[in-house]
């Protein structure tokens, strides 16, 4: 009986450790991102790829801020306020998720992530 109780307690403890934390940013579809860009041109569209990737093609109006160079100062240079809506993308969606987390850590409150440009079905320049 003691062993069974210990096993149940251990299982409860382990399942409690695997609970995922909720995202602090919003994940949106690329269609929703495009609709927001069209409706609200003051949104900041942030490309977190490297310069050469950005130069090869980017979403019109996107501002380059490579993932590795995001700091409080560099973010403030391209995002006017902490409440300004920011939509983040990269090549495949990995770096954009990391960047969204960093921006939330820096105090940005309206961060959205919409994946990568490789699946972007709309215009690029």
Q: Where are these predicted regions, by residue range?
A:
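Intrinsic disorder/low-structure terminal segments
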Residues: 10-12, 39-42
């Amino acid at each position: 009986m003691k062993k069974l109780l210990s096993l149940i307690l251990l299982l409860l403890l382990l399942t409690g450790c695997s609970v995922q934390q909720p995202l602090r940013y919003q994940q949106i579809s690329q269609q929703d991102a495009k609709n927001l860009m069209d409706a609200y041109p003051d949104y900041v569209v942030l490309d977190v790829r490297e310069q050469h990737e950005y130069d090869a093609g980017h979403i019109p109006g996107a501002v380059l801020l490579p993932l590795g160079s995001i700091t409080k100062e560099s973010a403030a240079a391209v995002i006017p306020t902490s409440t300004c809506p920011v939509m983040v993308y990269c090549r495949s969606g990995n770096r954009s998720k990391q960047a969204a987390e960093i921006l939330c850590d820096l105090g940005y409150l309206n961060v959205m992530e919409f994946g990568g440009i490789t699946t972007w079905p709309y215009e690029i320049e």
